[in-house]
Amino acid sequence: MVVFATFTSAGVVRRALTQAGFVVKRFPALLEKRDDARLEKNMTLLVEGNYAPWNRLAASATSPNVIVVGAGIAGASTSWALSKQGFNVTLVEKAAEAAQEASGNLAGLMMPALATDQSSFAEYFIQAYLYSIQHAKTLAQSHQFNFSQTGIIQLAFNDRQQTRQKNWLELEHVADLLEWVSQEQVMALSGLDFSCSGVYFKEAAWLSPYLYVKSHIHACKASINCLFNCYVNQLHYEQGLWKLYDQHQHLIAEAPTLILANASDATRLLGQFSSVLPLSLRTVRGQVSALENHARISQLKLPVCYDGYITPVINGKII
């Protein structure tokens, strides 16, 4: 039951509200007005607003069964989120355990990908960053994965980066995310002598991706089905179901909803559907090197980004 009261009892207002499904009742006046109105309606309240595109959730599938392929950061966090919403999740991974490829790096940075405008696209990345930081902090309270919210410095190491940072600093909606730091401040914050200024993302963090993935799976292990050592050789879509087959044509799993979180291997699986699913997928190269600890570098207090990035020592290694 939804009840409203208003001093407005004009006929045009009452008729419009009646057409909208409300029961309008007139009551004796308060103060000097002749009539007041009270409105009642049994309804599920739906408020239409200026929702960002990523907040408009599609209607749920008729079946709560979902398959997620790939047990890295994307697959594990998606499985965790879906299980919290009551979905029956089957997580399929070709390796013997989770986070065996890029998500198994020793260290990963959590910092915003900023644009120089205020588009919905730019806002999405800001909100994703803020959510990720808060989610990691909450998860770290019950699971250990070396979460360090030290902040991160992005050096203004060339003219292009200096221009980008100047544009960032002029945007009001990101003012709380970063601050300009001089060369001297960079040295004080980082512990090393760098030759340029930069911006300091004060809420940014770094963590162990491998343990972060493991924490997600452990947090929902009672409500998801993990299938390791399962290589998905082919996808079939038959009668509303996605069916996954291994290299021996044995059925691995089937469900009406399929989520591919297996990096570049998704292009192989979707190749046969290119005519009906014309997705623009491309492989992005990435490379991380782990170096032995060095006495001077060991003084680094927080991650510093330039054309790449460098982290403090973790497990005796510098990333």
Q: How would you label these PLM feature ranges?
A:
Residues 107-189:
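Dinucleotide-binding Rossmann-like beta1-alpha1 core, especially the glycine-rich loop
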Residues 37, 42-62, 67-85, 94, ...:
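Active-site substrate-recognition segment that forms the wall
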Residues 5, 122-128, 155-161, 199-218:
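Short beta-strand to alpha-helix junction loop
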Residues 11, 96-98:
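Helix N-cap at the beta1-alpha1 junction of Rossmann-like dinucleotide-binding domains, i.e.
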Residues 16, 81, 215, 219:
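Rossmann-fold NAD(P)-dependent oxidoreductase module
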Residues 199-248, 253, 261, 265-267:
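Helical element adjacent to the flavin cofactor pocket in flavoenzyme catalytic cores
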